[in-house]
Design a protein with these regions (language model features):
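Flexible coil segments in periplasmic/lumen-exposed cytochrome c-class electron-transfer proteins
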Residues: 1-101, 138-180
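Extended hydrophobic-aromatic, low-complexity segments
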Residues: 100-101, 114-115, 128-129, 141
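Short, cysteine/histidine-rich loop/knuckle motifs that typically chelate Zn2+
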Residues: 105
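Short Cys/His-rich local motifs and their 1-3 flanking residues in nucleic-acid-associated proteins
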Residues: 108
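Short functional micro-motifs and their immediate structural scaffolds
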Residues: 111
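Short cysteine/histidine-rich zinc-coordinating motifs and their immediately flanking basic loops
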Residues: 115-121
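Extended intrinsically disordered, low-complexity coil regions enriched in Ser, Thr, Gly, Ala
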Residues: 121-133, 137-145
Length: 180
């Protein structure tokens, strides 16, 4: 691609309206699920029902048939997170809660990223937890990974879940997208 073609592509994709991919829902119970195709899918029929969420994140397709069978790239997902996790995550993200650094210092005021530092707003909470855990344990390697080690050093698994719930609930410009 030429420089002009790259600029044209960047302009085109940059002009597209941001579309939420994950809807965050705080809850005490979640649909019972099975794992298929790397996804949590709600059980149907006699096996269907609810179970306590505990300290988990369950990401499932909004419309199982569209996602699993039709492979609709716009069907979206719902991320179930424990009740209260968004508020706890907000405290960790916005002021560090004496455990970590305020995320906006590097990731921007609206958590949309700054320069080479990636955005966090609206990302899959499961993905965010995995990245935080991998940086804490040293599994994640990369140019910027070492900068995150002191940031994640004191975080517990629950802290990571709460941070991920909050960041996933944020949209462009810091708008809340969570449901209760």
């Amino acid at each position: 691609m030429s420089d002009d073609e790259i600029k044209a592509a960047a302009t085109y994709f940059g002009s597209m309206k941001w579309t939420p991919w994950i809807r965050v829902v705080e809850t005490d119970t979640v649909p019972k699920t099975r794992i298929a195709g790397g996804m949590f899918l709600a059980l149907e029929g006699a096996e269907a029902g609810k179970e306590p969420i505990g300290q988990r994140i369950i990401e499932a397709p909004e419309k199982t048939e569209e996602t699993e069978l039709l492979r609709n790239p716009r069907s979206g997902f719902v991320a179930y997170v424990p009740t209260g996790s968004i508020k706890k995550g907000e405290a960790l993200v916005t002021n560090g809660a004496n455990k970590t650094t305020q995320c906006a210092v590097c990731h921007g005021a609206d958590l949309e990223g700054l320069g080479p530092v990636p955005g966090l707003a609206g990302r899959s909470p499961s993905y965010v937890v995995r990245q935080l855990h991998d940086m804490q344990t040293g599994v994640r390697k990369g140019t910027w990974s070492d900068l995150m080690k002191p940031v994640v050093a004191k975080l517990t698994a629950e802290d990571m879940l709460n941070i991920a719930a909050y960041t996933a609930s944020r949209g462009p410009g810091g708008a809340s997208r969570s449901a209760r």
